[in-house]
Amino acid sequence: MSYIDGFLIAVPVAQRDAFIQHAGTFDAIILEYGAVRVMECWADDVPHGKLTDFHRAVQARDDEAVVFSWIEWPDKATRDSGM
């Protein structure tokens, strides 16, 4: 069964290109350690909720976007040795 590490972060909108470049470097490294897939998803239609939402979860400022990413590993043992 696959094992997933998930991440939710706030990234300054003005730093999007730098984030993408950094994420690409990280992705290549983590794949060498056994990850099957790495995804970064830049939010473009994430509404603000009434009680809670992704924006509040990361305390995103008005100039920041929410990024949801995950690493898929073949199993927990590979993840533990890769991290």
Regions found by a protein language model. Name each.
Residues 1-83:
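Short S/T/G/P-rich N-terminal loop/turn motif that feeds into the first structured element of a domain
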